[in-house]
């Protein structure tokens, strides 16, 4: 009894889904011929049988078996999709303005069979699985057995209804709208100019290399001709070469003689002085000019240095140098120094004006310097002159 009630339940569900599809598409509802089945009033045992544990699994297995059979039969019959050719698509139907949600009871028109009740609730899982491709040979669905529910029927859940059975076999309809314009062919114009530029470059660079080899070819024959002419001239003017050879050594010998002349005065610059029966070489005399006029400055204080002494005699235009003599070991002044002039007139004026003047903290004492009398060479010359005169 439970198996029969489950099959009847499935048939009723399929019939309900077919009616729902027809109502959505706006087609007239045609009820399939149904054998008169006595509808017992007490439907309680049927409901109790559906609620059993095995009813759901049996219904699910039967739905899967039917879906597999329908797929295996309808699969080969599907026509391959035809590519879209052009404006062969019929114009779409004007959309029917319907509200977003209409109660199920109001969607159905008045049926002549008023005594046949409809189920008030269909599970969501059964709605999705019951809707599927139907084979033409399948029997029409049977209406669902009526049973009473407490309260008004709840509204159906929103879902997109499947397309009608006649349109499932064909390809999906193409979107209706303005066709996109065909792509325009791209005409490459810029690359045509590049070959002309590349061809022009070789013509510019090939011209100079053609001229250079010609010049190089012309130059080599000139060089051997010059060598031949030079060799010929050398053969003719052979005696002139020995004359050029002695000229070079003469130029080299001249600087050698100059060097000898320069070295001689260096030897004469040695200043050997004599005093108290002893002689020594005084290198300090090389700092002074040999033809100047020097003044001996005595009685100088310890605070007097070269700058103070030079400041005292710098007012004379021919003033050359002033120096204070100091001890080499201690660096203390010895109390005297020397001042030199280039002009003898300034020398005489300084002797008159500066003698006895204060330079520092003491009056200065001036007299003629006798450094030449202490020179060895000068002393020997004087001795020779005296011998010639017969004085000593």
From Swiss-Prot:
Keyword RNA-binding (UniProt): yes
Source taxon at top rank: Eukaryota
Gene3D superfamilies: 3.30.70.330
Region (Disordered): 372-392
Cited Pfam families: RRM_1
InterPro entries membership: Nucleotide-bd_a/b_plait_sf, RBD_domain_sf, RBM42_RBP45_47-like, RBM42_RRM, RRM_dom
Keyword field contains RNA-binding: yes
SMART domains, alphabetized: RRM (SM00360)
Residue ranges of coiled coil: none
Residue ranges with Basic residues bias: 381-392
Domain RRM residues, every copy: 293-371
GO MF: mRNA binding
Protein location: Nucleus; Cytoplasm
Predominant cellular place of this UniProt entry's protein: nucleus
CDD domains assigned to the protein according to its UniProt record, in alphabetical order: RRM_RBM42
GO CC, any one term: cytoplasm
Keywords: Cytoplasm, Nucleus, RNA-binding
The protein's role, per its UniProt record: May bind RNA.
Family statement: Belongs to the RRM RBM42 family.
Record protein name field: RNA-binding protein 42
């Amino acid at each position: 009894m439970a198996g029969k009630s489950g099959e009847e339940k499935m048939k009723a569900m399929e019939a309900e889904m077919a009616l729902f599809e027809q109502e959505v598409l706006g087609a007239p509802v045609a009820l399939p011929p149904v054998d008169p089945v006595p509808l017992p009033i007490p439907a309680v045992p049927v409901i109790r049988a559906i609620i059993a544990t095995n009813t759901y699994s049996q219904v699910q297995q039967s739905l899967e078996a039917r879906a597999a059979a329908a797929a295996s039969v309808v699969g080969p019959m599907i026509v391959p999709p035809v590519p879209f050719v052009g404006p062969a698509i019929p114009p779409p139907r004007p959309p029917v303005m319907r509200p977003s949600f209409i109660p199920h009871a109001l969607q159905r028109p008045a049926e002549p069979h008023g005594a046949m009740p409809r189920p008030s609730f269909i599970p969501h899982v059964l709605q999705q699985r019951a809707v599927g491709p139907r084979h033409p040979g399948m029997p029409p669905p049977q209406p669902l057995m009526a049973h009473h529910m407490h309260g008004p029927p709840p509204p159906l859940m929103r879902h997109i209804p499947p397309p009608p059975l006649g349109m499932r076999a064909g390809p999906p309809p193409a979107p209706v709208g303005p066709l996109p314009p065909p792509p325009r062919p791209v005409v490459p114009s810029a690359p045509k100019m590049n070959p002309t530029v590349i061809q022009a470059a070789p013509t510019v660079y090939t011209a100079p290399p053609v001229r250079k080899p010609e010049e190089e070819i012309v130059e080599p024959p000139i060089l051997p001709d010059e060598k031949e002419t030079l060799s010929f001239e050398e053969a003719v003017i052979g005696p002139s070469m020995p004359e050029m050879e002695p000229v070079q050594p003469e130029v080299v010998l001249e600087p050698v003689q100059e060097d000898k002349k320069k070295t001689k005065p260096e030897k004469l610059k040695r200043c050997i002085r004599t005093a108290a029966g002893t002689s020594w070489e005084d290198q300090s005399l090389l700092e002074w000019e040999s033809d100047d006029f020097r003044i001996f400055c005595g009685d100088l204080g310890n605070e007097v240095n070269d700058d103070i002494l030079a400041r005292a005699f710098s007012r004379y235009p021919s003033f050359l140098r002033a120096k204070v003599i100091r001890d080499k070991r201690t660096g203390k002044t010895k109390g005297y120094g020397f001042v030199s002039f280039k002009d003898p007139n300034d020398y005489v004026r300084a002797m008159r004006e500066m003698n006895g003047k204060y330079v520092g903290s003491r009056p200065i004492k001036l007299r003629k310097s006798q450094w030449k009398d202490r020179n060895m060479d000068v002393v020997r010359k004087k001795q020779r002159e005296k011998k010639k005169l017969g004085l000593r």
